[in-house]
Amino acid sequence: MVKFEHHAFPLDLAALNAEVILRCLNNNEKKFKLLNELYVKQKSWAIGSDIIKINELIKKVGFEFNLSDEKMNTCLKDERIQDEILNQRIEAQKKYKIESTPTIIINEKNYAGKVDYKDFKKAIDKKL
């Protein structure tokens, strides 16, 4: 059995807010699609230093997944969600000794930074 988990590791406020928007979505299947879309469009929203503008760009991606402006704004103001994300980041950093992003963990082994697809595939195939 293969289980994929996404653990946020925000390095700045833009990444934190993108993860907050992701957590606004209740449908797990759609969450991975939204996560993928956020990564694909990252260069279009993770630009500049004006967080209000960045949030509007992140929300454009959320709109594609039928998240309302009201729902996303409510989530962005929810400090519990932010605290949960940041606490998970701290725990993961300690547990897995994460020093760079992305870091992929397969059965407790770290693959950090840019991972060659062939090496990554071999590691997964060995576990299947």
Regions found by a protein language model. Give the residues of each.
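C-terminal cap of thioredoxin/glutaredoxin-like
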Residues: 60-128
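Structural alpha/beta surface segment adjacent to cysteine/selenocysteine redox centers
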Residues: 1-63
